[in-house]
Amino acid sequence: FDTGLVINDKNFKKPCLDGYAGNYPCLGYDLLAQISLREFGSNSANDNWGWKDPETEKEYVLLGLDDGTAFIDISDPENPIFLGKLPTASTTSPWRDVKVFKNHAFIVSEAQNHGLQVFDLTKLRSVKNFEIFDASAILEDFGNAHNIWINEASSFAYVMGSNLYAGGPVFIDISAVSYTHLRAHETIR
């Protein structure tokens, strides 16, 4: 697949007319660009989140794929740039969830033995060519999880639907500057 290139097919740019931009419901938003799964080298995608770099003001999409997480620079929305990919921590899965706290992405998946991947998003500032990234940290206290939610005020992440506590919440203190020593807190019952 093509990597590190601006992927912009003028045929994908569609205005929102009568509630649709091309084949997609649009709610008043035009479709400016589209990147195919083929470009990501993946079979499916299920979730996305965003990050705006507080230093450069650039905006990024963090896209959950069956085999990892893609990072796309959308600072020029008509010319998105696929910067790179963080491979899955274990096996493929059709479910991956991504959230952001400060300048880090927190990623869970229903893939067995995946745990929580943490990725330092400031690494995206220096990308010149497509990269395969490594996680900045991995928490392996649980294997799979369905979702992650972050309370920015308390600096806690809540992992839901994991293989721990009958799928109940796992509380994780993410206040540390370095995430290399994350530990899950036991659920209080």
Q: For each of these PLM feature ranges, what is it?
A:
Residues 1-183, 189:
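Feature marking well-ordered beta-strand scaffolds used for ligand recognition
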